[in-house]
Amino acid sequence: MDPLRAVSLDLDNTLWDTPPVLLRAESALRAWLEAEAPEIARRFTTADLTRLRLSVAAESPTRAHDLSFVRTEALRRAARAAGYDDALAERAFSVFLSARNDVVPYAEVPATLARLAARLPLYALSNGNACVWRAGLGRHFVAAVDAAGAGAAKPDPRIFARLLEVAAVPAASVLHVGDDAEADVAGARAAGLRTAWMNRTGTPWPAERPPPDYEIADLEGLERLVGRLLGAPD
């Protein structure tokens, strides 16, 4: 087996609980629209804006992986329909994105990331538009690869290929960690990476799927796993 030389980490629901973050971000956007663009708020509910994003993604399949583009374009369409210019949509998206990056890491994450980063290079690998630097965790990472920059979302092999290009190491020497059975585990396995399933909820692994190489319950479990793989004390 190739020696372990790097770890890639999914972000949402791996380093922080994402649903509350998205709820707060949507609430922040709604409050801003009500104050700064009341005609959009009057014409479009949050559910309406969600449907508009789905329409944008369906109409732009080559860019549907770029969640920032999809949301901004949906806001542009809403702004135009309500008599506002595109610049307002850009400001609205900035409000959302700021709140989107106001995350609360799981309790063990900051300290454990620091210890892991002292042992191996860490890379962020995410389909979303959260940023580890804006989220306050960037100092632990060598680099971040996201779907927008890679031109594809997990489990597409192109995003993993981009990660390997950035890390400049063979696929078999990278351990990818994430919570999604398809995007993270199946995608990483198909690209030749080792896989660790982040299972914080104790959910049984889907019986119809090939299992991950490893299963962990939190980042401290990853730290112990890395210690074993490096042949060092936990």
Predicted features by range, described:
Residues 1-7, 19-20, 84-87, 110, ...:
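Asp-based, Mg2+/Mn2+-dependent phosphohydrolase catalytic module
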Residues 2-107:
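N-terminal helical cap/lid subdomain that shapes the substrate entry/recognition surface
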